[in-house]
């Protein structure tokens, strides 16, 4: 039976049937041809083309198997590098991605019989990082290209430099915040100190008799000198003796300044109390209403 011509309904139907992956047991690796059922595979193995191809492979089977193995390994690593890079992925999941290609090299044509054996081979050769856990094998590609290695090292160095610069900026920012906080605290302390009342000393002039008492309000800078002069003047009274009389007369007797100050304060307090009593407190609205009601009651009583 001849083969259907291209574009005919029979050819289109066969193409739709052969689209996608088929059973691996019905795939001929020697001829690289996929059959759709067991009968088709049996007919293919009895065909003249298949027998001729098997005779060619039988001349040097090891070389043919090695070629298939190298091609399988090359395609597998290329897809891993381009699709996932150096990311870690489950080995069986990635193998399913690899066999999606209809024209891929099947593993039954290579020297590896199982996926576990092939995964261990990749780890021993240093082509991939292989990790095994309770979920199975995980692989990740190892990039050995010198240019890529230099680029990765430069990227890591730049990341470390950026990290150190960021840490330095954060440290400087913390120091600035600390200095600003300390300066603010010092300013508040200075304001509190300046707002406090300074102690005032009363400097009394008792040098001349008969003159009114003079009080000088000095600042805290002259406190010690003014205080010493005051007590020296108070504690050392001066006396004069008359030659004509036998009695000693007191020429200069210091006055009790504090007693006079107390008297003046009492007098001022008394005057302020008298003035406060004389000033009438304004009445409230309730008091006005009560007064009006009282006046009305008085008028009613008078009329009666």
Curated annotation (Swiss-Prot):
GO terms for cellular component: cytoplasm; nucleolus; nucleus. Its main location: nucleus. SMART domains: Kin17_mid. Residues 204-228, 261-291 are annotated as: Disordered. PANTHER family: DNA_RNA-BINDING PROTEIN KIN17, KIN17 KIN, ANTIGENIC DETERMINANT OF RECA PROTEIN HOMOLOG. Belongs to the KIN17 family. This is KIN17-like protein. It comes from Schizosaccharomyces pombe (strain 972 / ATCC 24843).
């Amino acid at each position: 039976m001849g083969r259907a011509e291209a574009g005919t309904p029979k050819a289109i139907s066969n193409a739709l049937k052969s689209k996608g992956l088929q059973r691996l047991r019905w795939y001929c690796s020697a001829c690289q041809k996929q059959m759709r059922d067991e009968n088709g595979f049996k007919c293919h193995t009895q065909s003249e083309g298949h027998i001729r191809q098997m005779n060619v492979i039988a001349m040097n089977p090891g070389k043919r198997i090695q070629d298939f193995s190298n091609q399988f390994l090359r395609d597998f690593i290329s897809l891993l590098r381009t699709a996932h890079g150096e990311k870690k992925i489950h080995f069986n999941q990635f193998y399913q991605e690899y066999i999606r290609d209809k024209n891929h090299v099947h593993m039954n044509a290579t020297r590896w019989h199982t996926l576990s054996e092939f995964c261990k081979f990749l780890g021993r050769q240093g082509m991939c990082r292989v990790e095994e856990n309770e979920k199975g094998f995980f692989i990740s590609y190892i990039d050995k290209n010198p240019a890529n290695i230099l680029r990765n090292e430069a990227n890591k160095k730049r990341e470390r430099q950026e990290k150190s610069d960021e840490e330095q900026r954060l440290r400087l920012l913390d120091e600035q915040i600390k200095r600003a906080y300390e300066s603010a605290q010092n300013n508040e302390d200075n304001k509190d100190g300046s707002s406090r009342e300074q102690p005032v000393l009363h400097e009394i002039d008792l040098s001349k008799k008969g003159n009114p008492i003079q009080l000088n309000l000095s600042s805290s800078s002259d406190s010690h000198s003014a205080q010493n002069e005051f007590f020296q003047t108070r504690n050392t009274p001066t006396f004069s003796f008359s030659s004509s009389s036998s009695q000693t007369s007191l020429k200069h007797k210091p006055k009790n300044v504090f007693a006079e100050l107390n008297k003046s304060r009492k007098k001022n307090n008394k005057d302020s109390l008298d003035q406060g009593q004389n000033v009438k407190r304004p009445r409230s609205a309730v008091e006005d209403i009560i007064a009006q009601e009282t006046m009305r009651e008085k008028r009613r009583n008078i009329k009666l």
